[in-house]
Each structure stands twice: as C-alpha cells, then as structure tokens.
Amino acid sequence: TSGRPLSSFPVPETVREGMDPLIIGLTRAREELYARIDRRVELMFEQGLADEVRELMQAGYTEQDPGMRGIGYREFFLMRRWGCLTAVGVKELIKRNTRRYAKRQITFFRHIPSVHWFSPSRSAEIRTFIENNLILL
C-alpha cells in the first residue's frame, strides 16, 4: 500500500463532472446498535478471536503491522504490553472501542447533507428509493 488515504490522491475534474452520488445511510437506535456491537464481539470470541491473535503473535506479527492496528487486534497487544488486562478486560475494551468507532462514523456521515437515512428493517423502502433514483450509465 502507499500508506496514504484514498482521499489524498487527486481526482481529475472530468471524473467529477456530472457525478451526483446516491448515498444511503442505515441508522439504528443507539441502544440497539450497542447491543448488536456487544453481541458481535461475543461471537468473535466464541469463534476463536483470542486463539487467532495468539497464533498471529507467535508467527511474529507485532502491533506495528498494519493489520494488527485494527479494533479487535490492538487490544490484545495492549493486554500483553500492560500485563494488567484480563481476557474479559480485552473483550470489554474491544466493545468500547467499537462503540466509539461507530459513533465517529455516525458523526462523519451526519455532516454529509446528501445522505438519505433509512432503518435497516425497511429494505423494501430502500429498494424502491434506489430504483427511483438510480441512473444507468
């Protein structure tokens, strides 16, 4: 990889002309979102996340490797470095960090006025909206 975010690369003006993207956002009640995050983290642990990270560490991966900096991996490196976190503590830290990441994403997209927000349970409404607004090139 280049180490640079995609947004740092120039986009020719000819590509931007006539582009009006259709942006759809999915929104949930905060309590529901947080409960889903908690369930997802529990499932990740049930499916062997701790063993996966342990094997990666044994294979020589470190917290400096890009793939190990993501939520769900870096917390294990913190546990090893600090030595004071338990597996339960790591799990709670992953939940907290995921909730914070979700909040940042929501904040980012809320500042984009062209986002059309829907509840994920309204799939028929979303499909109709897309069909009514999709322009085939």
What are the roles of these predicted feature ranges?
Residues 1-137:
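Phosphate/pyrophosphate-binding catalytic cores of soluble transferases and nucleic-acid-acting enzymes
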